[in-house]
């Protein structure tokens, strides 16, 4: 897919246009007792998106499929038009919410065949997304993580420096210090203190090294020495009495819509789970993307005690495959934490009703739910989420119906989930390692 030469110019012109902002419906928190940060993921910009009478040529990401209902903010068979991404960031900028920082967990390029992209075009898309964020949020520290599509060929992120690693190291310099830039350039990962909260460290992992389709890391026990680096970094944070938020693209654990399928290779998943268990007192939260769905997980120790909260954020892109029945509405989210110990207090999930936005020609981003209010839990701590998971697992759980509706970001309230479907969801929420996950399936399937 050749990107037009005047692409960046077009982006900046679009940026000056008002995409139509929704009224933020989140509660106002005037007291400084609550800190906040945004999480955005899976932008998947498709620069070819345009409205045309030939619905097989609306976007490269539809791969020639007939796009039935294209509008200014996209279509479910297409990745994001720039106007959709801009509307998301404009909503964040004008939401009235004060945030200390933003995490951005990867995947800027579109889902298109390998031959339609190149290293240059992938870097160009990442550049344009970075420039958009930096222009809209010049004073906000942003912590990116690389996704499996943030490379060419897709998924093949290497164990040593590359053109993409070097390019993002230069692009993200305004947000990171020299040490972070150095490890990012070498292996696509880094750690960085939050400027406004110096005892909080962000660890941005390159979990794409552990992704099944990545042939560059086959038969390697510690690709790019990231495991060793991670343990050293967490040990240092433990000694220095820091708290850590772990961010990455591909999550730990099992996919909630598949059977016995970890999001990454089994060996690597077990290794990460082991590290996270040993340093659970340091890690105050884990945040991922990749699945395009809204889900949570609770990491437990080997005795079944909940020790870590894990959040997988839904995508901004609404894209789905032709044969898929369900997809997601575009979403972004805001986390609230307790300054000092960085305990996660709440999460506010915002979304765009894509059908409505296209009909009206304006984007009305609204609050989909506030986690504590939606589920009646005290906070986002592991014990609270473990209790919620137990509620979700009960027979005829109304809480689970709500959870499954939010899983697709309120895309389709009639989406069915039979007993097998529910079991896969519950087992994925509560079991991140092989032994406990398989035991869960044996007990419930």
Curated annotation (Swiss-Prot):
Residues at which Zn(2+) 2 binds: 107, 148, 249, 290
CDD domains from the UniProt entry: MPP_ASMase
Biological process terms in GO annotation: negative regulation of cGAS/STING signaling pathway; nucleoside triphosphate catabolic process
Principal location: secreted
Annotated S-S bridges: 59-78, 417-421, 427-440
Positions annotated with a glycan in the UniProt record: 66, 128, 219, 235, 353, 364
Keyword Signal assigned: yes
Cofactor requirement: Zn(2+)
Keyword Kinase on entry: no
Molecular function GO terms recorded: ATP hydrolysis activity; phosphoric diester hydrolase activity; zinc ion binding
Endpoints of the signal sequence: 1-22
Cell compartments where the protein resides: Secreted
Keywords: Disulfide bond, Glycoprotein, Hydrolase, Metal-binding, Secreted, Signal, Zinc
Catalytic activity: 2',3'-cGAMP + H2O = 5'-pGpA(2'-5') + H(+); 5'-pGpA(2'-5') + H2O = 5'-GpA(2'-5') + phosphate; a ribonucleoside 5'-triphosphate + H2O = a ribonucleoside 5'-diphosphate + phosphate + H(+); ATP + H2O = ADP + phosphate + H(+)
E.C. number: 3.1.4.-, 3.6.1.15
GO cellular component: extracellular region; extracellular space
Enzyme class name: hydrolase
Pfam family, one: ASMase_C
Subunit structure: Monomer. Homodimer; homodimerizes following 2',3'-cGAMP-binding.
Function: Cyclic-nucleotide phosphodiesterase that acts as a negative regulator of innate immunity by mediating degradation of 2',3'-cGAMP, thereby inhibiting the cGAS-STING signaling. Specifically linearizes 2',3'-cGAMP into 2'5'-bond pGpA and further hydrolyzes pGpA to produce GpA. Also has in vitro nucleotide phosphodiesterase activity with nucleoside triphosphates, such as ATP. Has in vitro activity with p-nitrophenyl-TMP. Has lower activity with nucleoside diphosphates, and no activity with nucleoside monophosphates. Has in vitro activity with CDP-choline, giving rise to CMP and phosphocholine.
Family: Belongs to the acid sphingomyelinase family.
Family annotation (PANTHER family): ACID SPHINGOMYELINASE-LIKE PHOSPHODIESTERASE 3A (PTHR10340:SF24), SPHINGOMYELIN PHOSPHODIESTERASE (PTHR10340)
The protein's name in its UniProt record: Cyclic GMP-AMP phosphodiesterase SMPDL3A
């Amino acid at each position: 897919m050749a990107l037009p030469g005047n692409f960046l110019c077009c982006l900046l012109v679009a940026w000056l246009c008002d995409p139509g902002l929704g009224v933020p419906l989140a509660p106002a928190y005037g007291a400084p007792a609550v800190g906040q940060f945004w999480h955005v993921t899976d932008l998947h910009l498709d620069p070819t998106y345009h409205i045309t009478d030939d619905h097989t040529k609306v976007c490269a990401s539809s791969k020639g499929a007939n796009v039935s209902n294209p509008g200014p903010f996209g279509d479910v068979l297409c990745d994001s038009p720039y106007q959709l991404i801009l509307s998301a960031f404009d909503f964040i900028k004008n939401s009235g919410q004060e945030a200390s920082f933003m995490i951005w967990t990867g995947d800027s390029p579109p889902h298109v065949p390998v031959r339609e992209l190149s290293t240059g075009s992938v870097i160009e898309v990442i550049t344009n997304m970075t420039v958009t964020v930096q222009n809209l949020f010049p004073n906000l520290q942003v912590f990116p993580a690389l996704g499996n599509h943030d490379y060419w060929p897709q998924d093949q992120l290497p164990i040593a420096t590359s053109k993409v690693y070097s390019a993002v190291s230069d692009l993200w310099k305004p947000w990171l210090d020299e040490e972070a830039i150095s490890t990012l350039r070498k292996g696509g990962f880094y750690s960085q203190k939050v400027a406004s909260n110096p005892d909080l460290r962000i660890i941005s992992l390159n979990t794409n090294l552990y992704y099944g389709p990545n042939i560059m890391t086959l038969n390697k026990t510690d690709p790019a020495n990231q495991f060793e680096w991670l343990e050293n970094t967490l040990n240092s944070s433990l000694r220095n009495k820091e708290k850590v938020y772990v961010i990455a693209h591909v999550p730990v654990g099992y996919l909630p819509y598949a059977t016995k399928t970890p999001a990454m290779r089994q060996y690597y998943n077990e290794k990460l789970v082991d590290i996270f268990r040993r340093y659970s007192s340091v890690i105050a939260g884990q945040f991922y993307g990749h699945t395009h769905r809204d889900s949570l997980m609770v990491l437990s120790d080997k005795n079944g005690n909940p020790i870590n909260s894990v959040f997988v954020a839904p995508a901004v892109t609404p894209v789905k495959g032709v044969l898929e029945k369900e997809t997601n509405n575009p979403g972004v989210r805001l986390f609230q934490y307790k300054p000092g110990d960085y305990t996660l207090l709440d999460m506010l999930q915002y979304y765009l009703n894509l059908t409505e936005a296209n009909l009206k020609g304006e984007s009305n981003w609204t609050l989909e739910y506030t986690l504590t209010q939606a589920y009646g839990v005290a906070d986002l701590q592991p014990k609270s989420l473990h209790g919620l998971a137990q509620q979700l697992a009960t027979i005829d759980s109304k809480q689970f119906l709500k959870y499954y509706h939010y899983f697709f970001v309120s895309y389709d309230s009639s989406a069915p989930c039979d007993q097998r479907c529910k079991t896969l969801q519950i087992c994925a929420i509560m079991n991140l390692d092989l032994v406990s996950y398989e035991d869960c399936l044996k007990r419930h399937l």
